[in-house]
Amino acid sequence: MNKTVYIFGLVLLLSLGLLGSNSYAAGTSGRSGFMMLNSSDLIGASVRDYAGEFAGIVNEVMIDSGGHAFAIVNHGDYGLYGEEGANTPVPFEALRISQTKSGEEKVVFKMDAERLDFGPYLDPTMPINRQREADIYLHYGIEPYWVGSRTAEKGELKEFNSLNLVSAAVENSCGKVIGIVNEVMVDPDGHAFAVINHGDYDIFGENGVNTPVPFQELRISKTKDGQDIVFLKTDTEHLDFAPYLGYPLKTNSRQYEASIYEFYGIQPYWTQGSGLSK
């Protein structure tokens, strides 16, 4: 099964959990149940419907240009779809994700499996565009996030393979390489960030520091040989002072996520029209 992580645009919170470690902070809940998730940990996780019946497995994670993620669930009647089944994008809002005692991701589809069976599936002949993404949201009774939003990106979607994105070089506006993409992380509502490994290695050690960056602050393109390259829209110094993983605030908290958005002058999505959600 192809365990690729796709990205309609760019990606989400990437992390290190602890500096100098390859294990990340995803999968541990805060007091309110808030949880940061490594997309790589979700791939291969079993998906069950609200009745506890097996519905499929997470095959990929996709992100759109606005940094919103979908779990691609492989499922279906294999006699009908063939041995590879069908791959259906499901908004994170339609999923409940937790961890088992053994540390494995547990994914529950909040609706019955029939809704999944009739959901819009990935079709190589039908590239994802804004209308098709809207159809995905509406199939699950979710209003597309850009409807009524003054800040959400409404342009054409772009698609990236996150396995190519991870380890991609990150350049500043002057074309200087300042770091690499280290991982891909998502919050419970499917909002994503790219975690950039960077910094003065004489200060931070050989592993540098890992900083989550909202997709709005990145531009992604491809080199002539097809490799992804990431451009930071702000200056390098701005990145150096941004909230990093291991920052004094607890990584798995709304307060920490808010500090990331606010550092870049972005209003946290859950505060629009209300106070900070805890």
Task: For each feature predicted by the language model, list its residue ranges.
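Bacterial N-terminal signal peptides
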Residues: 9-18
